[in-house]
């Protein structure tokens, strides 16, 4: 990141920041995408098992990943304010925190997974695949969370192209292992959805190893000497980190877990409905990678400018990010409307699943505008380190408005499973409105503060 003086310079720098993040997120998502699509071609039961497993795993992983994402705005503001010497301490303490969080998640999962799955009244093969999927994924928790911290450090320096290269190097490993283990090629057993979990876990370890090697040997990362000194664990540092990270993590958890909750509630419907819902939701999540990537870029850009006390520049980056998100939303809405049949065919060859997935995809169009506003706005707010109010706003929008409304529509109207999608759409719309208002308030506060300091 560097200081800019014109709007065109900011736009160029933002796009150069965003594009590698986008490729990185798409590559990471591709792992989940291939897990789902390949499992679906193994059988509808494998697809349903992976759907249930990921619906439990994703909210947990994204919520804790969100907490660890606090590394990015903290480091970005330190770099912006010329406090490079403080960065290694922040990163190492965050790594310690990531490892501790990993063990806590594994311990809770050991006791909680079986009761959760038993309470869902799934078909026996689906429950078995989901349980095995989660058991294997647990082995990849430590590398995934540790990588999240190290990626936050790399991205905060504006070197998003590096994380893109790391992920692109790892993606072929995931695809090849999926192909071999799910379908049983080259003498390996045919494991179905369980093979997808093994492939993802192995890939997480590969990503971590590559990242550590780059940080130790390549500039500008090596000059920070991140691993030169292993600082003693500092509870006060953890507390400061968590003050920012916990609201970020819970805000992400509230958003992702509502989708997972809907998938779990779908267990009351048939395996066909679960599979169709998972296919449509998986593609909607693919499109979500764009506003999510824009949000990450906004956190870096806004955080850098706020650290340097260039508040007007931070405000301009906010508008650039939201404008680009709305443009992409329009493009994706057109894609969903005209190519729903082709998209559904990617996930399944089962006629019933295919037909129902097409119906769900139409609802995904309505997700686009809300996601285009809410997600980038959250990224900008993180750059300002304003996270507590947005946490409350997302809780209300998604869990007080969206999910209860979806349950009512699905249970007491003829919409059935589609009622959950309508509830999600309305909840996302409220969330986008709340968050946009908050961003305007924060920008105004910093504008007034800037005038007073002159």
From Swiss-Prot:
* Name of protein: Probable multidrug resistance protein NorM
Query: So where does this one cross the membrane?
Result: 13-32, 47-69, 90-112, 132-154, 166-188, 193-215, 244-266, 286-308, 317-339, 359-381, 388-410, 420-442
Query: Where found, per UniProt?
Result: Cell membrane
- Role noted for this protein: Multidrug efflux pump.
Q: Which InterPro entries has this protein been placed in? A: MATE_fam, MATE_MdtK, MdtK-like
Keyword Phosphoprotein appears in the UniProt entry: no
What are the alphabetically sorted keywords of the record? Answer: Antiport, Cell membrane, Ion transport, Membrane, Transmembrane, Transmembrane helix, Transport
Q: Could you tell me which species this protein originates from?
A: Bacillus cereus (strain ATCC 10987 / NRS 248)
Q: Report the domain of life of the source organism.
A: Bacteria
Q: What is its main location?
A: membrane
Membrane topology term = Multi-pass membrane protein
